[in-house]
Curated annotation (Swiss-Prot):
Broad EC category: transferase
Function: Catalyzes the phosphorylation of thiamine to thiamine pyrophosphate (TPP). TPP is an active cofactor for enzymes involved in glycolysis and energy production. Plant leaves require high levels of TPP for photosynthesis and carbohydrate metabolism.
Pfam family, one: TPK_catalytic
UniProt keywords, alphabetically: ATP-binding, Cytoplasm, Kinase, Nucleotide-binding, Transferase
EC number: 2.7.6.2
Catalytic reactions on record: thiamine + ATP = thiamine diphosphate + AMP + H(+)
Protein name per Swiss-Prot or TrEMBL: Thiamine pyrophosphokinase 3
GO BP, sorted A to Z: thiamine diphosphate biosynthetic process; thiamine metabolic process
Length: 267
């Protein structure tokens, strides 16, 4: 069997980097899109907004931007902050966005897309599909999508959002909250996760949500896995820790896994 290709991951997008933010891409050529769902904005929302080339609010996520962005800039004029952080698109069922918020952004040129006819997919699913199929990002081969507000709140919403990671396994999608981030590790690759200690860790986890794993091997963790099987009803790797001396965590598995790591609140 041919060796699997390696995939590298990094949370460096959470580090301050004005030059990269202005370009909408990192030095490695990664392009970013931002999705905002209907949960409280994390403290680093403006940083990711500035990095993104496309900003999409999923329905009630527009309320969160309208209300929450000025709260992240105390002392600044709220209307000026709202003008600065105007979403490109509001998309979804449009049953949660407040009428006055929808009108405000529509008058500023935001595209409003009513998807209320589609009751079979979540707002996150609709927005990811829009970004990957229809957005103005010219080269989507190295696209990374940040989803804010996908964690926290109702558990069924969280599970629906995690399911979207499995529905789009060939796209890099990162779900973020103030406390942690998660993303999918496709079984088609081995994975090298570069640890940014100033902003993340040490607590982490590897979870076989989609299907059991017969064999998973890791390096760089306090409790490494060595051809270990994982499944619900058996062992899953939660409350693990990135070793203090580790700069990279490596993971190889026969199953898709969810990686999660804590975020430091001073970042």
């Amino acid at each position: 069997m041919a060796p699997r290709p390696a995939m590298s991951h990094s949370s460096a997008f959470l580090l301050p980097s004005p030059s990269a933010a202005a370009a909408g891409a990192d030095a490695d050529g990664a392009a970013y899109a931002l999705l905002v769902l209907n949960q409280r904005l994390p403290r680093f929302a403006p940083r990711l907004w500035d990095r993104a080339q496309v900003r999409v609010c999923a329905d009630g996520g527009a309320n969160r931007v309208f209300d929450g962005m000025p709260e992240l800039f105390p002392g600044q004029d709220p209307d000026e902050v709202r003008r600065r952080y105007k979403p490109d698109v509001i998309k979804g069922d449009l049953d949660s966005v407040r009428p006055e918020v929808k009108e405000y952004y529509s008058n500023m040129g935001t595209q409003i897309v009513d998807e209320s006819h589609d009751q079979d997919t979540t707002d996150l699913h609709k927005c990811v599909a829009f970004i990957t199929e229809n957005s103005a990002i010219p080269n989507k081969s190295n696209l990374c999508i940040f989803a804010l507000g996908a964690l926290g709140g109702r558990f069924d919403h969280e599970m629906g959002n995690i399911n979207v990671l499995h529905l789009f396994p060939n796209n890099r999608i990162i779900l973020l909250s103030d406390d942690c981030l998660i993303f999918l590790l496709p079984r088609t690759h081995t994975h090298n996760i570069h640890i940014e200690r100033s902003i993340e860790g040490p607590h982490c986890g590897l979870i076989p949500i989609g299907a059991p794993s017969a064999t998973t091997t890791t390096t760089g963790l306090q409790w490494n896995l060595d051809n270990t099987s994982m499944s619900f009803g058996g062992l899953i790797s939660t409350s693990n820790i990135v070793r203090e001396e580790s700069t990279v965590v490596t993971i190889t598995s026969d199953s898709d896994l969810i990686w999660t790591i804590s975020l430091r609140h001073h970042s």
